[in-house]
């Protein structure tokens, strides 16, 4: 392997800012922030907006969108008839 061309692979804390959930994993992500983890060590911190703890698919708090209503709105807006 060539020296100096590979990103630094290290342990990083990912923090979900919407649900105050954090987990530690290995990553090459770059960040300037750090946080003290539960084990007392300091790790780089990367903040994410959505994780499995806050995403509607994983939390079961999904809402179904009615595509039929959107089609009807479009047809009304542009005066398109169904031609039946």
From Swiss-Prot:
Source organism phylogeny: Bacteria, Pseudomonadati, Pseudomonadota, Gammaproteobacteria, Chromatiales
Coiled coil start-end: none
Protein's GO biological process: translation
Keywords: Ribonucleoprotein, Ribosomal protein
SUPFAM superfamilies membership: L28p-like
Gene Ontology CC, one term: ribosome
Any Pfam family hit: Ribosomal_L31
Family recorded in the similarity comment: Belongs to the bacterial ribosomal protein bL31 family. Type B subfamily.
Presence of the UniProt keyword DNA-binding in the record: no
Disulfide bonds: none
GO molecular function: structural constituent of ribosome
InterPro entries: Ribosomal_bL28/bL31-like_sf (IPR034704), Ribosomal_bL31 (IPR002150), Ribosomal_bL31_B (IPR027493), Ribosomal_bL31_sf (IPR042105)
Protein name: Large ribosomal subunit protein bL31B
Subunit field text: Part of the 50S ribosomal subunit.
């Amino acid at each position: 392997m060539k020296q100096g061309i590979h990103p630094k692979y290290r342990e990083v804390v990912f923090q979900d800012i919407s649900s105050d959930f954090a987990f530690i994993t290995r990553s090459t992500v770059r960040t300037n922030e750090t946080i003290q983890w539960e084990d007392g060590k300091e790790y780089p911190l990367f903040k994410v907006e959505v994780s499995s703890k806050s995403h509607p698919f994983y939390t079961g708090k999904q809402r179904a969108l009615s595509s039929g209503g959107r089609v009807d709105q479009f047809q009304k807006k542009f005066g398109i008839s169904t031609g039946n």
